[in-house]
């Protein structure tokens, strides 16, 4: 049986950080500074405005939403009373923060550009931030070439990171405290750039 595709919703500028949650697809329309939720019926709800460009999305175990704020390198938390800074990523993120994945314990792994790639400067590798549920930020891994696009395996024991300018997917073992070890090549996608060409 052939697959049939159709447009569910349109009118967006540049969508990033898709996450499925509570029966809807949540996305960051980063160049329009807003977080949206798209229903299976095509309805679109504006969840949050983020003038510093939203990117990665996730949820804490209690249901509160986390949103990466790119240009000011902050992790925002959507509380009942409004939006609060959950963590400051500027000590680790050397340029814009980007994608994120949140585990079942509320720990967030957050990537960043590493450098201003639009400036024409050579690739500069960067670190991956681990944000604990209390907002404490530590370095989870080093020397990643534009980590942007991450997943945790269903058992939560392996983190896979797309290194856009490394042209590879890198895997790590996840310990009980969220720390990463046993870095290894999970897949090489040379000459394709993951997350740029749709890989």
Label every PLM stretch briefly.
Residues 172-179:
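Short loop/turn segments immediately following beta-strands, especially the blade-tip
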Residues 30-31, 70-71, 115-126, 164-167:
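Short, solvent-exposed loop/turn segments at conserved positions within beta-propeller repeat blades
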Residues 45-49, 84-88, 138-142, 180-188:
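Beta-propeller fold detector
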Residues 38-41, 61, 78-82, 87, ...:
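Flexible "stalk/tail and boundary" regions
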Residues 8-22, 50-69, 74, 91-108, ...:
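Beta-rich, blade/repeat-based domains predominating
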Residues 26-48:
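Beta-propeller domains
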Residues 1-11, 40-42, 183-184:
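A short helix->beta-strand "capping" segment at the edge of beta-propeller domains
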Residues 34-36, 74-76, 126-129, 168-170:
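A short loop-to-beta-strand structural motif that recurs across blades of beta-propeller domains
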């Amino acid at each position: 049986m052939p697959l049939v595709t159709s447009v569910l919703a349109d009118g967006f500028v540049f969508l990033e950080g898709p996450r499925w949650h509570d029966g809807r697809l949540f996305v960051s329309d980063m160049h329009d500074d807003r977080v949206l939720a798209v229903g299976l019926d095509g309805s679109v709800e504006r969840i949050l405005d983020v003038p510093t460009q939203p990117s990665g999305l996730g949820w804490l175990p209690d249901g509160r939403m986390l949103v990466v704020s790119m240009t000011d390198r902050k992790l925002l938390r959507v509380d009942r009373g409004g939006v609060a800074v959950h963590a400051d990523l500027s000590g680790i993120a050397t340029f814009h923060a980007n994608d994120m994945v949140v585990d079942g314990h509320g720990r967030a792994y957050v990537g960043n550009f590493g450098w201003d790639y639009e400036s024409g400067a050579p690739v500069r590798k960067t670190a991956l931030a681990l944000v604990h549920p209390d907002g404490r930020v530590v370095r989870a891994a080093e020397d990643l070439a534009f980590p942007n696009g991450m997943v945790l395996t269903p058992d939560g024991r392996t983190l896979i990171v797309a290194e856009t300018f490394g042209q590879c997917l890198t895997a790590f073992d996840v310990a009980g405290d969220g720390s990463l070890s046993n870095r290894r090549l999970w897949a090489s996608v040379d000459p394709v750039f993951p997350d740029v060409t749709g890989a």
